[in-house]
């Protein structure tokens, strides 16, 4: 079993509530078959809770109830599966092009009994028209200048992108500003989430999209 500190447990209880056991089982999948199949590096196992699962799950605060969320480049389910566990009211579509990752994701979804998750084996750009999400999430996929083109089209003209980023978030926004506006982004901001729960809060770039709204 993966060790969890008192601080991590407190945060996990606050985020996952009565679904904490599901989160613990997910972490065990990451630590075992996830590392065996190359989805998570072995060195990451001691910090799965803080650096990965809690870092991702806390962004549920930024997502409205009942939203359809598309997670681009879902990989090991970060943040997609974290959100599905923390928020059973959400409908999750995990978009992942690599077969071995898709197989692993589906195995975990089945084992945890997550009825609010669909796993799609495809590239994000090929999912346009098949997916019409309210919110699109991503973590460690690519720079925002490229990520905007992979995420915004999945919103069907209106919605939000919530991308987990690092300290360079502001700089990435500056470089991607033109592309974001062209795609229908009307407001882009950096939001720090989980300062009251996490030792290292999560930084996200939030893009509000509305193609029908004219940008000055």
UniProtKB/Swiss-Prot annotation:
UniProt: S-adenosyl-L-methionine binding residues: 73, 78, 124-125, 139
Broad class of enzyme this protein falls into: transferase
A Gene Ontology cellular-component term: cytosol
InterPro entries, sorted: rRNA_ssu_MeTfrase_G, SAM-dependent_MTases_sf
Broad class of the protein's primary localization: cytoplasm
Keyword DNA damage: no
The organism's place on the tree of life at top rank: Bacteria
Enzyme Commission no: 2.1.1.-
Entry's localization field: Cytoplasm
Keywords: Cytoplasm, Methyltransferase, rRNA processing, S-adenosyl-L-methionine, Transferase
One Pfam family linked to the record: GidB
GO molecular function list: rRNA (guanine-N7-)-methyltransferase activity
Job of this protein: Specifically methylates the N7 position of guanine in position 518 of 16S rRNA.
Family: Belongs to the methyltransferase superfamily. RNA methyltransferase RsmG family.
Name of this protein: Ribosomal RNA small subunit methyltransferase G
Upper classification of the organism: Bacteria, Bacillati, Actinomycetota, Actinomycetes, Micrococcales
């Amino acid at each position: 079993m993966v060790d969890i500190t008192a601080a991590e447990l407190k945060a996990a209880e606050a985020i996952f509530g009565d679904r904490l056991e599901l989160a613990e089982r997910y972490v065990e999948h990451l630590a075992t078959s996830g590392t065996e199949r190359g989805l998570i590096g072995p060195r990451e196992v001691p910090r799965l809770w803080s650096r990965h699962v809690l870092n991702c799950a806390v962004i549920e605060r930024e997502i409205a109830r009942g939203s359809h969320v598309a997670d681009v480049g879902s990989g090991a389910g970060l943040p997609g599966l974290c959100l599905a566990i923390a928020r059973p009211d959400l409908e999750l579509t995990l978009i992942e092009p690599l077969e071995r990752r898709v197989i692993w994701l589906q195995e975990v979804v089945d084992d945890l009994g997550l009825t609010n998750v669909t796993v799609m084996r495809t590239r994000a750009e090929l999912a346009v028209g098949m997916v019409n999400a309210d919110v699109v999430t991503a973590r460690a996929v690519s720079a925002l200048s490229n990520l905007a083109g992979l995420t915004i089209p999945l919103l069907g003209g209106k919605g939000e992108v919530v991308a987990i980023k690092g300290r360079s978030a502001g700089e990435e926004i500056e470089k991607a500003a033109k592309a974001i506006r062209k795609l229908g982004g009307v407001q882009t901001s950096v939001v720090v989430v989980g300062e009251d729960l996490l030792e290292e809060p999560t930084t996200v770039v939030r893009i509000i999209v509305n193609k029908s709204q004219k940008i000055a």
